[in-house]
């Protein structure tokens, strides 16, 4: 009898474990990022990016395939031998709804999908666009070059904004996952790239469990809607900073304080550094 109970409990535990493993990241509130860099203060003003040698723009025309739901997406598209030559071209940055894929949705009083938190693929009313299009997926592919002088640098892939969730691959290898539509996402891709041409694949989901929070009175678009950049940084660089001012009682003057966090990814653990400021 005890053996039967043991086998039953083991079967139940295995079933629950399998169900937990089948929950996608974009419907799992415990997962908001995988292998993603920590958030930090703005390191470069937008007006100075065009003249910054450490920032390489990856904006342009990317290969693109739109799927009405996750089940019909090309799941192997990230592989190096997957042929995307017959795919459409899409502008990045840009939402895919304004480029002929799917439909823009405006709502100010209800969710544009079935309310079943944290799920976003349940069956909504038949008049909903999401009734026949359960969480559309956009598959993006592009290439970029890594020069010889970049190989001794630290390389970061920087997305300024992607709605609503995305997976990233470099040269067929999974780099990570991110959601949080209104904030940047960065990945350290130093160990994923080769000298010469590299293949970047991004899989974007229109909805995620984060969409329950991103429910303002607004038009609902999706895609890689803000710039994508390759950040080429030295092995020792500023990771983050904090700036504060202490005002005098009469507000006639103020003391300026700066805290700077450095990241050292070089082989040298000691040395002399200088910090310059321009006010």
Language-model regions: role of each:
Residues 1-22:
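Bacterial Sec-dependent N-terminal signal peptides
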Residues 118-129:
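Short glycine/proline-rich turn/loop motifs
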Residues 74-76, 213, 238-242, 273:
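Short, charged, solvent-exposed linker or helix-capping segments at domain edges/interfaces
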Residues 170, 253-279:
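Beta-strand-rich binding/interaction modules
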Residues 25, 30-33, 48-49, 63-67, ...:
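Accessory beta-strand-rich segments of carbohydrate-active enzymes
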Residues 55-57, 80, 135-139, 150, ...:
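Short, surface-exposed loop/turn motifs at beta-strand boundaries within globular domains
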Residues 242-250:
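Short beta-strand segments of immunoglobulin-like
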Residues 20-119, 199-207, 230:
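Accessory carbohydrate-binding/adhesion or oligomerization-edge regions at the termini
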